[in-house]
Protein backbone atom coordinates (compact mmCIF):
# COMPACT_ATOMS: atom_id res chain seq x y z
CA UNK A 1 0.00 0.00 0.00
CA UNK A 2 1.47 3.39 -1.00
CA UNK A 3 2.12 6.30 1.30
CA UNK A 4 -0.70 8.32 -0.26
CA UNK A 5 -3.20 5.52 0.37
CA UNK A 6 -1.98 5.05 3.93
CA UNK A 7 -2.53 8.68 4.66
CA UNK A 8 -6.13 8.49 3.42
CA UNK A 9 -7.06 5.39 5.52
CA UNK A 10 -8.62 6.07 8.90
CA UNK A 11 -6.80 4.98 12.05
CA UNK A 12 -10.00 3.38 13.48
CA UNK A 13 -12.19 0.78 11.88
CA UNK A 14 -15.79 1.46 11.03
CA UNK A 15 -17.13 -0.71 13.87
CA UNK A 16 -15.04 1.04 16.55
CA UNK A 17 -15.88 4.47 15.12
CA UNK A 18 -19.61 3.75 15.21
CA UNK A 19 -19.40 2.69 18.86
CA UNK A 20 -16.92 5.48 19.65
CA UNK A 21 -14.41 2.96 21.00
CA UNK A 22 -10.68 2.90 20.82
CA UNK A 23 -9.47 0.76 17.95
CA UNK A 24 -6.28 -1.23 18.64
CA UNK A 25 -4.52 -3.39 16.06
CA UNK A 26 -2.60 -6.36 17.40
CA UNK A 27 1.13 -6.27 16.57
CA UNK A 28 1.08 -9.76 15.06
CA UNK A 29 -1.81 -8.78 12.79
CA UNK A 30 0.03 -5.67 11.71
CA UNK A 31 3.08 -7.72 10.75
CA UNK A 32 0.96 -10.24 8.90
CA UNK A 33 -0.81 -7.48 6.98
CA UNK A 34 -4.36 -8.41 8.01
CA UNK A 35 -4.91 -5.07 9.85
CA UNK A 36 -7.71 -6.41 12.01
CA UNK A 37 -8.34 -4.78 15.38
CA UNK A 38 -8.55 -6.85 18.54
CA UNK A 39 -12.26 -6.08 19.08
CA UNK A 40 -13.22 -7.31 15.63
CA UNK A 41 -11.10 -10.47 16.10
CA UNK A 42 -12.84 -11.29 19.37
CA UNK A 43 -16.23 -10.58 17.82
CA UNK A 44 -15.25 -12.61 14.78
CA UNK A 45 -16.49 -9.94 12.39
CA UNK A 46 -14.93 -8.35 9.40
CA UNK A 47 -12.74 -5.37 10.32
CA UNK A 48 -12.96 -2.64 7.72
CA UNK A 49 -10.78 0.47 7.76
CA UNK A 50 -12.43 3.09 5.62
CA UNK A 51 -10.80 5.97 3.75
CA UNK A 52 -10.83 9.51 5.06
CA UNK A 53 -13.25 11.84 3.30
CA UNK A 54 -11.73 14.84 1.61
CA UNK A 55 -11.75 17.98 3.79
CA UNK A 56 -14.63 20.31 2.94
CA UNK A 57 -12.57 23.36 3.87
CA UNK A 58 -9.79 22.60 1.43
CA UNK A 59 -12.37 22.04 -1.32
CA UNK A 60 -13.99 25.41 -0.66
CA UNK A 61 -10.63 27.16 -0.67
CA UNK A 62 -9.73 25.66 -4.05
CA UNK A 63 -13.07 26.67 -5.56
CA UNK A 64 -12.78 30.18 -4.11
CA UNK A 65 -9.25 30.59 -5.45
CA UNK A 66 -10.45 29.73 -8.94
CA UNK A 67 -13.37 32.12 -8.70
CA UNK A 68 -11.33 34.92 -7.13
CA UNK A 69 -9.21 35.15 -10.26
CA UNK A 70 -12.23 36.33 -12.26
CA UNK A 71 -13.70 38.64 -9.61
CA UNK A 72 -10.47 40.26 -8.38
CA UNK A 73 -11.06 43.56 -10.14
CA UNK A 74 -14.66 43.85 -8.93
CA UNK A 75 -13.77 43.05 -5.31
CA UNK A 76 -10.95 45.62 -5.23
CA UNK A 77 -13.16 48.38 -6.64
CA UNK A 78 -15.89 47.69 -4.07
CA UNK A 79 -13.42 47.92 -1.20
CA UNK A 80 -11.84 51.10 -2.53
CA UNK A 81 -15.20 52.88 -2.89
CA UNK A 82 -16.59 51.80 0.48
CA UNK A 83 -13.67 51.98 2.91
CA UNK A 84 -12.14 55.29 3.96
CA UNK A 85 -8.50 55.60 2.84
CA UNK A 86 -5.98 55.11 5.57
CA UNK A 87 -4.73 52.56 8.01
CA UNK A 88 -7.63 50.41 9.29
CA UNK A 89 -7.20 48.06 12.22
CA UNK A 90 -9.19 44.82 11.78
CA UNK A 91 -9.69 42.25 14.49
CA UNK A 92 -8.65 38.64 13.63
CA UNK A 93 -11.94 37.48 15.19
CA UNK A 94 -13.66 38.77 12.06
CA UNK A 95 -12.34 35.92 9.91
CA UNK A 96 -12.65 33.36 12.71
CA UNK A 97 -16.36 34.03 13.21
CA UNK A 98 -17.08 33.70 9.50
CA UNK A 99 -15.08 30.47 9.28
CA UNK A 100 -17.06 28.86 12.10
CA UNK A 101 -20.36 29.69 10.41
CA UNK A 102 -19.26 28.38 7.02
CA UNK A 103 -17.77 25.07 8.13
CA UNK A 104 -19.91 24.38 11.20
CA UNK A 105 -16.80 22.99 12.95
CA UNK A 106 -14.68 24.50 15.73
CA UNK A 107 -11.31 25.80 14.75
CA UNK A 108 -8.56 23.26 15.46
CA UNK A 109 -10.83 20.16 15.43
CA UNK A 110 -9.65 16.78 14.27
CA UNK A 111 -11.90 16.89 11.24
CA UNK A 112 -9.14 18.30 9.02
CA UNK A 113 -6.26 20.72 8.82
CA UNK A 114 -7.02 24.14 10.25
CA UNK A 115 -5.35 27.50 10.39
CA UNK A 116 -5.07 29.36 13.69
CA UNK A 117 -5.29 33.09 14.28
CA UNK A 118 -1.57 33.55 14.21
CA UNK A 119 -1.21 31.51 11.02
CA UNK A 120 -3.91 33.53 9.29
CA UNK A 121 -2.35 36.93 10.00
CA UNK A 122 1.13 35.56 9.36
CA UNK A 123 -0.04 34.45 5.93
CA UNK A 124 -1.42 37.91 5.23
CA UNK A 125 1.99 39.31 6.18
CA UNK A 126 0.70 42.15 8.39
CA UNK A 127 0.19 43.01 12.03
CA UNK A 128 -2.98 44.37 13.63
CA UNK A 129 -2.64 47.61 11.63
CA UNK A 130 -3.74 46.43 8.22
CA UNK A 131 -3.68 48.67 5.18
CA UNK A 132 -6.80 47.95 3.17
CA UNK A 133 -5.25 48.81 -0.18
CA UNK A 134 -2.34 46.39 0.40
CA UNK A 135 -4.71 43.40 0.44
CA UNK A 136 -4.94 41.30 -2.69
CA UNK A 137 -7.86 39.01 -3.58
CA UNK A 138 -5.66 35.92 -3.24
CA UNK A 139 -4.54 36.85 0.30
CA UNK A 140 -8.03 37.48 1.66
CA UNK A 141 -9.98 34.44 2.93
CA UNK A 142 -12.81 33.69 0.52
CA UNK A 143 -15.87 31.48 0.67
CA UNK A 144 -18.58 30.17 -1.56
CA UNK A 145 -20.69 32.43 -3.74
CA UNK A 146 -23.81 32.16 -1.54
CA UNK A 147 -22.09 33.63 1.53
CA UNK A 148 -19.34 35.78 0.03
CA UNK A 149 -17.92 38.32 2.50
CA UNK A 150 -18.80 41.78 1.17
CA UNK A 151 -17.18 45.17 1.68
CA UNK A 152 -20.21 46.34 3.68
CA UNK A 153 -19.64 43.60 6.24
CA UNK A 154 -16.01 44.58 6.45
CA UNK A 155 -16.84 48.22 7.25
CA UNK A 156 -19.36 47.19 9.92
CA UNK A 157 -16.89 44.81 11.60
CA UNK A 158 -15.62 45.74 15.08
CA UNK A 159 -12.29 47.52 15.18
CA UNK A 160 -9.47 46.98 17.64
CA UNK A 161 -9.04 49.53 20.45
CA UNK A 162 -6.01 51.18 18.81
CA UNK A 163 -7.79 51.97 15.56
CA UNK A 164 -6.44 54.86 13.53
CA UNK A 165 -9.69 55.36 11.63
CA UNK A 166 -10.96 58.09 13.96
CA UNK A 167 -7.70 60.00 13.64
CA UNK A 168 -7.76 60.06 9.85
CA UNK A 169 -10.21 62.92 9.40
CA UNK A 170 -10.16 64.46 12.88
CA UNK A 171 -7.98 67.33 11.73
CA UNK A 172 -9.13 67.36 8.13
CA UNK A 173 -12.75 68.18 8.95
CA UNK A 174 -12.18 70.64 11.78
CA UNK A 175 -13.98 73.99 11.19
CA UNK A 176 -11.62 76.94 11.54
CA UNK A 177 -13.52 80.10 12.45
CA UNK A 178 -10.61 82.32 11.39
CA UNK A 179 -10.87 81.03 7.82
CA UNK A 180 -14.57 81.94 7.66
CA UNK A 181 -14.95 85.51 8.95
CA UNK A 182 -18.44 85.79 7.48
CA UNK A 183 -19.71 83.19 9.95
CA UNK A 184 -18.75 85.22 12.99
CA UNK A 185 -21.23 87.31 14.89
CA UNK A 186 -21.64 90.80 13.39
CA UNK A 187 -22.74 94.07 15.00
CA UNK A 188 -26.46 94.95 15.08
CA UNK A 189 -27.93 96.81 12.15
CA UNK A 190 -27.70 100.59 12.22
CA UNK A 191 -31.49 100.88 12.47
CA UNK A 192 -31.44 98.72 15.60
CA UNK A 193 -28.67 100.86 17.11
CA UNK A 194 -30.47 104.11 16.34
CA UNK A 195 -33.76 102.78 17.73
CA UNK A 196 -32.05 101.77 20.97
CA UNK A 197 -30.34 105.16 21.16
CA UNK A 198 -33.66 107.02 20.80
CA UNK A 199 -35.08 104.92 23.63
CA UNK A 200 -32.12 105.70 25.89
CA UNK A 201 -32.38 109.42 25.16
CA UNK A 202 -36.08 109.49 26.02
CA UNK A 203 -35.53 107.51 29.22
CA UNK A 204 -32.76 109.88 30.29
CA UNK A 205 -34.91 112.94 29.56
CA UNK A 206 -37.79 111.48 31.54
CA UNK A 207 -35.65 110.60 34.55
CA UNK A 208 -34.02 114.05 34.66
CA UNK A 209 -37.31 115.89 34.12
CA UNK A 210 -39.09 114.04 36.93
CA UNK A 211 -36.19 114.25 39.40
CA UNK A 212 -35.33 116.96 41.92
CA UNK A 213 -32.64 118.54 39.74
CA UNK A 214 -35.02 121.28 38.52
CA UNK A 215 -35.42 122.73 42.05
CA UNK A 216 -32.12 122.54 43.89
CA UNK A 217 -31.93 124.04 47.34
CA UNK A 218 -28.23 123.54 47.96
CA UNK A 219 -25.30 123.87 45.64
CA UNK A 220 -23.76 120.66 46.93
CA UNK A 221 -26.54 118.64 45.31
CA UNK A 222 -25.44 119.79 41.87
CA UNK A 223 -22.21 117.85 42.27
CA UNK A 224 -24.12 114.60 41.70
CA UNK A 225 -25.68 115.73 38.43
CA UNK A 226 -25.31 112.86 35.88
CA UNK A 227 -23.67 114.69 33.00
CA UNK A 228 -21.87 111.48 32.06
CA UNK A 229 -25.11 109.93 30.80
CA UNK A 230 -25.77 112.89 28.51
CA UNK A 231 -22.19 112.93 27.30
CA UNK A 232 -22.25 109.20 26.61
CA UNK A 233 -25.41 109.50 24.50
CA UNK A 234 -23.78 112.18 22.36
CA UNK A 235 -20.65 110.11 21.87
CA UNK A 236 -22.67 107.03 20.94
CA UNK A 237 -24.66 109.03 18.41
CA UNK A 238 -21.47 110.35 16.83
CA UNK A 239 -19.97 106.86 16.62
CA UNK A 240 -23.07 105.46 14.90
CA UNK A 241 -23.11 108.29 12.36
CA UNK A 242 -19.44 107.79 11.57
CA UNK A 243 -20.10 104.11 10.91
CA UNK A 244 -22.92 105.07 8.55
CA UNK A 245 -20.68 107.42 6.62
CA UNK A 246 -17.86 104.93 6.42
CA UNK A 247 -20.03 102.11 5.09
CA UNK A 248 -21.97 104.25 2.64
CA UNK A 249 -18.84 105.96 1.32
CA UNK A 250 -17.22 102.58 0.66
CA UNK A 251 -20.37 101.37 -1.10
CA UNK A 252 -20.37 104.48 -3.26
CA UNK A 253 -16.71 104.09 -4.23
CA UNK A 254 -17.30 100.50 -5.27
CA UNK A 255 -20.38 101.33 -7.31
CA UNK A 256 -18.93 104.47 -8.89
CA UNK A 257 -16.30 102.45 -10.75
CA UNK A 258 -19.08 100.86 -12.83
CA UNK A 259 -20.89 104.12 -13.64
CA UNK A 260 -19.83 106.45 -16.44
CA UNK A 261 -18.91 110.00 -15.45
CA UNK A 262 -21.14 112.89 -16.40
CA UNK A 263 -20.20 115.70 -18.73
CA UNK A 264 -17.95 118.52 -17.52
CA UNK A 265 -20.78 121.02 -17.74
CA UNK A 266 -22.81 119.13 -15.16
CA UNK A 267 -20.06 118.58 -12.58
CA UNK A 268 -21.28 121.40 -10.36
CA UNK A 269 -24.92 120.23 -10.44
CA UNK A 270 -26.03 117.24 -8.45
CA UNK A 271 -28.10 114.55 -10.10
CA UNK A 272 -29.83 113.76 -6.80
CA UNK A 273 -33.57 114.27 -6.70
CA UNK A 274 -35.81 114.08 -3.69
CA UNK A 275 -38.15 111.73 -5.53
CA UNK A 276 -35.40 109.09 -5.39
CA UNK A 277 -35.71 109.04 -1.60
CA UNK A 278 -39.18 110.40 -0.85
CA UNK A 279 -42.35 109.48 -2.64
CA UNK A 280 -44.65 111.75 -0.70
CA UNK A 281 -46.41 114.33 -2.83
CA UNK A 282 -47.88 116.09 0.19
CA UNK A 283 -44.45 116.78 1.64
CA UNK A 284 -43.23 118.27 -1.62
CA UNK A 285 -46.31 120.48 -1.90
CA UNK A 286 -45.99 121.62 1.72
CA UNK A 287 -42.33 122.49 1.42
CA UNK A 288 -42.88 124.17 -1.92
CA UNK A 289 -39.44 123.33 -3.23
CA UNK A 290 -38.61 121.99 -6.64
CA UNK A 291 -37.63 118.31 -6.62
CA UNK A 292 -34.74 119.07 -8.90
CA UNK A 293 -33.17 121.46 -6.43
CA UNK A 294 -30.19 120.15 -4.53
CA UNK A 295 -28.11 121.50 -1.68
CA UNK A 296 -25.12 119.26 -2.41
CA UNK A 297 -22.06 120.76 -3.97
CA UNK A 298 -20.82 117.61 -5.69
CA UNK A 299 -22.30 114.50 -7.20
CA UNK A 300 -20.44 112.43 -4.64
CA UNK A 301 -22.49 113.94 -1.83
CA UNK A 302 -25.76 113.20 -3.56
CA UNK A 303 -24.78 109.64 -4.39
CA UNK A 304 -23.83 108.92 -0.81
CA UNK A 305 -27.07 110.47 0.44
CA UNK A 306 -29.08 108.36 -1.97
CA UNK A 307 -27.42 105.23 -0.58
CA UNK A 308 -28.84 105.98 2.90
CA UNK A 309 -32.39 104.67 3.13
CA UNK A 310 -35.30 106.71 4.42
CA UNK A 311 -35.81 104.82 7.75
CA UNK A 312 -32.19 105.51 8.67
CA UNK A 313 -32.50 109.19 7.79
CA UNK A 314 -35.65 109.61 9.86
CA UNK A 315 -34.12 107.81 12.83
CA UNK A 316 -31.07 110.06 12.68
CA UNK A 317 -33.28 113.15 12.69
CA UNK A 318 -35.30 111.71 15.56
CA UNK A 319 -32.14 111.08 17.59
CA UNK A 320 -30.90 114.59 16.88
CA UNK A 321 -34.22 116.16 17.90
CA UNK A 322 -34.41 114.11 21.10
CA UNK A 323 -30.83 114.94 21.96
CA UNK A 324 -31.58 118.63 21.43
CA UNK A 325 -34.46 118.42 23.92
CA UNK A 326 -32.22 116.65 26.43
CA UNK A 327 -29.54 119.35 26.17
CA UNK A 328 -32.15 122.07 26.64
CA UNK A 329 -33.36 120.34 29.80
CA UNK A 330 -29.85 120.00 31.22
CA UNK A 331 -28.94 123.62 30.52
CA UNK A 332 -32.24 124.73 32.04
CA UNK A 333 -31.32 122.93 35.26
CA UNK A 334 -27.90 124.60 35.32
CA UNK A 335 -29.35 128.05 34.69
CA UNK A 336 -32.05 127.59 37.30
CA UNK A 337 -29.50 126.65 39.92
CA UNK A 338 -27.04 129.42 39.12
CA UNK A 339 -29.74 132.09 39.08
CA UNK A 340 -30.69 131.28 42.68
CA UNK A 341 -27.15 131.59 44.00
CA UNK A 342 -26.37 134.83 45.87
CA UNK A 343 -23.88 137.16 44.24
CA UNK A 344 -21.75 137.39 47.37
CA UNK A 345 -21.37 133.59 47.46
CA UNK A 346 -19.74 133.34 44.08
CA UNK A 347 -16.90 135.73 44.75
CA UNK A 348 -16.31 136.59 48.41
CA UNK A 349 -13.12 138.55 47.66
CA UNK A 350 -14.50 140.54 44.77
CA UNK A 351 -15.17 143.68 46.87
CA UNK A 352 -11.72 143.73 48.41
CA UNK A 353 -9.03 145.82 46.83
CA UNK A 354 -5.77 143.91 47.05
CA UNK A 355 -2.53 145.75 46.42
CA UNK A 356 -1.38 144.70 43.01
CA UNK A 357 2.19 145.43 42.27
CA UNK A 358 5.31 143.95 40.84
CA UNK A 359 5.17 141.04 43.25
CA UNK A 360 1.69 139.88 42.20
CA UNK A 361 1.55 136.17 41.38
CA UNK A 362 -1.06 134.11 39.64
CA UNK A 363 -2.07 132.26 42.78
CA UNK A 364 -2.89 135.54 44.51
CA UNK A 365 -5.67 136.40 42.08
CA UNK A 366 -9.23 136.00 43.41
CA UNK A 367 -10.81 132.72 42.38
CA UNK A 368 -14.38 132.30 41.23
CA UNK A 369 -16.92 130.08 42.85
CA UNK A 370 -16.17 126.36 42.57
CA UNK A 371 -19.73 125.55 41.51
CA UNK A 372 -19.68 128.06 38.67
CA UNK A 373 -16.34 126.76 37.50
CA UNK A 374 -17.57 123.19 37.36
CA UNK A 375 -20.79 124.20 35.61
CA UNK A 376 -18.80 126.16 33.07
CA UNK A 377 -16.55 123.17 32.43
CA UNK A 378 -19.54 120.85 32.10
CA UNK A 379 -21.21 123.18 29.60
CA UNK A 380 -18.07 123.34 27.49
CA UNK A 381 -17.69 119.55 27.45
CA UNK A 382 -21.33 118.99 26.53
CA UNK A 383 -21.26 121.62 23.79
CA UNK A 384 -18.12 120.11 22.30
CA UNK A 385 -19.82 116.73 22.14
CA UNK A 386 -22.97 118.26 20.63
CA UNK A 387 -20.94 120.15 18.06
CA UNK A 388 -19.31 116.87 17.02
CA UNK A 389 -22.79 115.45 16.52
CA UNK A 390 -23.78 118.39 14.33
CA UNK A 391 -20.62 118.07 12.27
CA UNK A 392 -21.20 114.39 11.58
CA UNK A 393 -24.91 114.87 10.92
CA UNK A 394 -24.07 117.52 8.35
CA UNK A 395 -27.05 119.76 8.97
CA UNK A 396 -27.13 123.14 7.25
CA UNK A 397 -25.69 126.02 9.23
CA UNK A 398 -29.14 127.50 9.72
CA UNK A 399 -30.16 124.39 11.68
CA UNK A 400 -27.09 124.24 13.90
CA UNK A 401 -27.56 125.17 17.54
CA UNK A 402 -23.86 125.60 18.27
CA UNK A 403 -22.48 126.83 14.95
CA UNK A 404 -24.86 129.80 14.85
CA UNK A 405 -23.06 131.41 17.78
CA UNK A 406 -19.70 131.41 16.02
CA UNK A 407 -20.93 132.52 12.60
CA UNK A 408 -21.13 136.03 11.27
CA UNK A 409 -24.19 137.67 9.84
CA UNK A 410 -23.15 136.92 6.28
CA UNK A 411 -22.71 133.23 7.05
CA UNK A 412 -26.03 133.10 8.91
CA UNK A 413 -27.81 134.48 5.86
CA UNK A 414 -26.61 131.57 3.74
CA UNK A 415 -29.24 129.14 4.92
CA UNK A 416 -28.82 126.83 1.95
CA UNK A 417 -25.12 126.15 2.51
CA UNK A 418 -23.91 122.95 4.04
CA UNK A 419 -20.62 121.95 5.55
CA UNK A 420 -17.80 120.57 3.46
CA UNK A 421 -18.80 117.10 4.56
CA UNK A 422 -21.57 115.28 2.75
CA UNK A 423 -25.03 115.55 4.25
CA UNK A 424 -27.51 112.78 4.87
CA UNK A 425 -30.36 114.84 3.48
CA UNK A 426 -31.23 118.08 1.76
CA UNK A 427 -31.82 121.34 3.57
CA UNK A 428 -35.56 121.53 2.95
CA UNK A 429 -36.02 117.86 3.92
CA UNK A 430 -34.42 118.44 7.32
CA UNK A 431 -36.43 121.61 7.88
CA UNK A 432 -39.68 119.88 7.01
CA UNK A 433 -39.01 117.12 9.52
CA UNK A 434 -38.11 119.55 12.29
CA UNK A 435 -41.10 121.72 11.44
CA UNK A 436 -43.43 118.77 11.96
CA UNK A 437 -42.24 118.48 15.56
CA UNK A 438 -42.97 122.09 16.46
CA UNK A 439 -45.95 122.59 18.75
CA UNK A 440 -48.30 125.36 17.69
CA UNK A 441 -47.68 127.90 14.99
CA UNK A 442 -44.33 129.58 14.63
CA UNK A 443 -42.52 131.40 11.93
CA UNK A 444 -39.33 129.56 12.73
CA UNK A 445 -38.70 126.33 10.88
CA UNK A 446 -36.84 124.67 13.78
CA UNK A 447 -38.15 126.01 17.07
CA UNK A 448 -36.40 123.43 19.24
CA UNK A 449 -32.98 124.17 17.81
CA UNK A 450 -33.60 127.91 18.19
CA UNK A 451 -34.60 127.45 21.83
CA UNK A 452 -31.45 125.44 22.51
CA UNK A 453 -29.32 128.14 20.94
CA UNK A 454 -30.99 130.80 23.09
CA UNK A 455 -30.54 128.64 26.19
CA UNK A 456 -26.82 128.23 25.52
CA UNK A 457 -26.32 131.97 25.09
CA UNK A 458 -28.17 132.88 28.28
CA UNK A 459 -26.35 130.19 30.31
CA UNK A 460 -22.95 131.39 29.14
CA UNK A 461 -23.85 134.98 29.99
CA UNK A 462 -24.98 133.93 33.47
CA UNK A 463 -21.76 131.99 34.08
CA UNK A 464 -19.64 134.98 33.04
CA UNK A 465 -21.64 137.20 35.39
CA UNK A 466 -21.28 134.86 38.35
CA UNK A 467 -17.58 134.32 37.70
CA UNK A 468 -16.96 138.08 37.29
CA UNK A 469 -15.43 137.60 33.87
Curated annotation (Swiss-Prot):
Residues 13-47 bind DNA. The keyword tRNA-binding does not apply. InterPro entries: Carb_Metab_Trans_Reg, Zn2-C6_fun-type_DNA-bd_sf, Zn2Cys6_DnaBD. GO terms for cellular component: nucleus. GO terms for molecular function: DNA binding; DNA-binding transcription factor activity, RNA polymerase II-specific; zinc ion binding. Its main location: nucleus. SUPFAM superfamilies: Zn2/Cys6 DNA-binding domain. Residues 58-84 are annotated as: Disordered. Keywords: DNA-binding, Metal-binding, Nucleus, Transcription, Transcription regulation, Zinc. Residues 68-82 have a biased composition (Polar residues). Transcription factor that regulates the expression of the gene cluster that mediates the biosynthesis of Equisetin. PANTHER family: GLUCOSE TRANSPORT TRANSCRIPTION REGULATOR RGT1-RELATED-RELATED. This is Equisetin cluster transcription factor eqxR. The lineage of its organism: Eukaryota, Fungi, Dikarya, Ascomycota, Pezizomycotina. The gene is eqxR.
Amino acid sequence: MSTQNNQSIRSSCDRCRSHKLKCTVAPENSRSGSNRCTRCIRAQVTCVFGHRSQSKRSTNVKKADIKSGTNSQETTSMQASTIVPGRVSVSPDLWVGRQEVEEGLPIGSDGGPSMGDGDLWAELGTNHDLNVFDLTPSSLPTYNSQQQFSATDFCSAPMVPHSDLSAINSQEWQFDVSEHPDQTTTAPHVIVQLSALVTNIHETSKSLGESFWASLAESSQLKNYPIGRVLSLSQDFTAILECIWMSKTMDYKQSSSFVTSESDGQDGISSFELEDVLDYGELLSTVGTSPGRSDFSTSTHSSVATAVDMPTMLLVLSCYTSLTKLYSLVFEHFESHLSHLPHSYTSPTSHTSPRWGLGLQLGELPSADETCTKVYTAVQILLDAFQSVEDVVGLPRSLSAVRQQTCGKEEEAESGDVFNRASLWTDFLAKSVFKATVKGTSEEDCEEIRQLSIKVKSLKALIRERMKL
